[in-house]
């Protein structure tokens, strides 16, 4: 029997239409998630999220907030997933449990393009095994041993700020802080500092690269194959479609080659004059040397696995802490009362303006601690929702039965602006921590910038040491004024690219050193 091309196309089109219709009917009527409230269009198709995240540039997170106001604290946000905004805040610790088995959802984890890394690992037990190998490098004791390296980078940052005193030259502090955190994490990861603090302009291209990598998650969540496909394409073609991804791939290659040098036993950079790298004073205690000495199987010590781990360590280690430093700097400089109170505490603790801070002294300052906690709350960590799956237990929330295996997400943005837990939540108020009867310990339960549970951000100790030492040093030594910086444009979360971004029109939080 002979069929014309038009007949074949009609049959294929009809089959596709029947499949899509059946899929939509199943999702809306027969799927176990069909009982949960929420918009039907979003429950039927992922294209709704695609529209708000890709076309509207990172707006789906805000749409979720609107839906919660309309439908209540538990909603279905796509065909696979429910989202919870708990008015009491306590269910977060059930979803992000430290004792229960918690997988990641494959669809959500795929956005990172690093399935062999700790961040991208789906299975709970495999994640624990991989995490155990990294834990020693990020323990508090290990980070304390790293403080000479951290301190050397802070001193270099301050020397750059010293050069700018009295020049009336505005500085984008997000760039400067990103140079600081990058030089710290690259020294620790590879024993090779990338020396961004030496760049006269504070490496705006590097900061742009981090943003481009963050933006890419909007696409890779929807199309997991996209990143690997782009890697195999000619660079000219990649540049035609997305010039920013060339910067991301350059960094991936740089990380790949530096890890290869570690695998091949090379401790020093052979030609630092050509690649801008320098050896750091921690030759045998880098993160990747420790991974190679761990009990991970040989497969997890290959360049394929370690390269993915390196991408996540550098990206997370550089961007999230610099954002917190930037948010805190803005709120201090825009609030003379809070700034004055902090400076008084710093001056009492360190009479010598140019003295070197002891970590224990800095960590023991209550108001500085409150400033940091409040800054972390308003910087959010990840602006996007985080998703967990309880594969072995059914859960219950507010009378709703949640079948085991259901992807459940929650978002730091909504936890941190829960007015019941944090009254006047949009106000920068360190006293909510320092004046609490228990010193703010009860509020710590609801501060989820690093998430919670067995998959909590592994870099929490490093981030906090960087925050304490950097803020204590910079605000003890320098007098600054904001320059052409507007909260709504330059600080407020406007785009969720997994990590928070301000308005596209922002020139950054800029300051002038007096």
From Swiss-Prot:
Pfam families, per database record: p450
Enzyme class: oxidoreductase
Topology class, membrane: Single-pass membrane protein
Pathway of action: Secondary metabolite biosynthesis
Annotated protein name in UniProt: Cytochrome P450 monooxygenase MO6277
Job of this protein: Cytochrome P450 monooxygenase that hydroxylates polyporic acid produced by the nonribosomal peptide synthetase acyN to produce the less toxic metabolite ascocorynin. The hydrophobic substrate polyporic acid might approach the active site from the membrane and, after hydroxylation into ascocorynin, leaves into the cytoplasm. MO6277 appears vital to avoid high-level accumulation of polyporic acid in the fungal membrane.
Reactions the enzyme catalyzes: polyporic acid + reduced [NADPH--hemoprotein reductase] + O2 = ascocorynin + oxidized [NADPH--hemoprotein reductase] + H2O + H(+)
Membrane-spanning ranges: 6-26
Residues where heme binds: 457
Cofactors required: heme
UniProt lineage: Eukaryota, Fungi, Dikarya, Ascomycota, Pezizomycotina
EC number per UniProt: 1.14.14.-
Annotated PROSITE patterns: CYTOCHROME_P450
């Amino acid at each position: 029997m002979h069929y014309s091309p038009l007949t074949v196309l009609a049959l294929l089109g009809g089959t596709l239409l029947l499949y899509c219709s059946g899929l939509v009917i199943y999702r809306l009527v027969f799927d176990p998630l069909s009982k949960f409230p929420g918009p039907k269009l979003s429950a039927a198709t992922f294209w709704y999220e695609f529209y708000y995240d890709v076309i509207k540039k990172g707006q789906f997170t805000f749409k979720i907030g609107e839906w919660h106001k309309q439908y209540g604290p538990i909603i279905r946000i796509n065909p696979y997933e429910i989202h919870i905004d708990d008015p009491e805040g306590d269910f977060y610790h059930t979803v992000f449990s430290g004792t229960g088995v918690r997988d990641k959802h494959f669809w959500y984890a795929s956005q990172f393009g690093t399935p062999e890394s700790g961040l991208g690992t789906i299975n709970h037990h495999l994640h624990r095994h991989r995490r155990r190998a990294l834990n020693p490098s990020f323990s508090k004791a290990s980070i304390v041993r790293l403080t000479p390296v951290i301190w050397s980078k802070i001193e270099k940052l301050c020397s750059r700020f010293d050069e700018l005193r009295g020049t009336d030259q505005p500085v984008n502090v997000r760039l400067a802080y990103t140079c600081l955190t990058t030089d710290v994490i690259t020294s620790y990861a590879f024993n090779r500092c990338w020396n961004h603090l030496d760049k006269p302009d504070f490496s705006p291209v590097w900061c742009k690269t981090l943003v481009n990598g963050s933006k890419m998650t909007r696409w890779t969540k929807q199309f997991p194959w996209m990143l690997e496909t782009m890697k195999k394409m000619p660079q000219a073609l990649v540049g035609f479609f997305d010039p920013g991804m060339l910067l991301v791939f350059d960094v991936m290659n740089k990380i790949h080659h530096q890890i290869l040098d570690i695998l091949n036993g090379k401790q020093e950079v052979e030609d630092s004059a050509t690649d801008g790298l320098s050896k750091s004073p921690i030759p045998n205690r880098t993160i990747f040397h420790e991974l190679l000495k761990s009990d991970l199987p040989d497969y997890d010590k290959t360049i394929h696995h370690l390269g993915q781990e390196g991408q996540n360590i550098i990206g997370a280690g550089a961007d999230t802490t610099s954002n917190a430093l930037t948010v805190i700097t803005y709120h201090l400089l825009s609030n003379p009362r809070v700034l004055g109170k902090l400076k008084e505490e710093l001056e009492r603790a360190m009479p010598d303006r140019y003295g070197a801070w002891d970590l224990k002294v800095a960590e023991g300052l209550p108001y500085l601690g409150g400033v940091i906690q409040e800054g972390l709350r308003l910087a959010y960590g990840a602006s996007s929702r985080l998703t967990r799956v309880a594969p072995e237990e059914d859960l219950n929330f507010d009378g709703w039965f949640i079948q085991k295996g259901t992807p459940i997400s929650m978002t730091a943005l909504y936890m941190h602006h829960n007015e019941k837990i944090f009254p006047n939540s949009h106000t920068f108020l360190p006293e909510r921590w320092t004046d609490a009867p228990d010193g703010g310990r009860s509020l710590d339960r609801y501060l989820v910038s690093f998430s919670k549970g067995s998959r909590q951000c592994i870099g929490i100790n490093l981030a906090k040491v960087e925050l304490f030492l950097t803020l204590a040093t910079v605000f003890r030594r320098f007098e600054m004024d904001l320059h052409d910086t507007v909260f709504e444009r330059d600080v407020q979360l406007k785009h969720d690219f997994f990590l928070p971004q301000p308005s596209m029109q922002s020139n950054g939080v800029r300051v002038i050193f007096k």
